[in-house]
Amino acid sequence: MISNADIQAAWIAKIKTTPTVTARVPAVEVREDQWKGERFTYPNIRVKLGLLTPTQPNSVCLVFRSEVAIRVYVEQKSSKTADEIAGIVATAFWSHPFSQGGVKFIAVNLTSIEPADVPEWDENSWLSTVNFTCLVSAA
């Protein structure tokens, strides 16, 4: 069984080593969505997991369906940068299988890109989200 924690850690590690992404967002600002540090530096990326579902309804299932949201935050007057970074993330990972940290991402399917919008908790920033559905197994 693959855990959500393993999948999230694999995504974070992979994003941190993807030059097209880290050219716009410092690797130290790529973290799990639940991170509760005291400093929130922009731009940043947070990795949020959705459902982890077995592809076969039995205890011997080796492939799972995983939902992941890559959330891009910026603090600027315009939403343009958030949308640009979201596009870079989508391009870097859509249909590009990878292995990281003991997890093999057999298929990485882009399900949507949410255009930048102002999050309800911070009127000075923008949030754009890239949503993927993946097939994963142990590497």
PLM feature segments, named:
Residues M1-V60, K80, H96-I106:
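Small/polar-rich, solvent-exposed N-terminal microdomains that initiate assembly or binding
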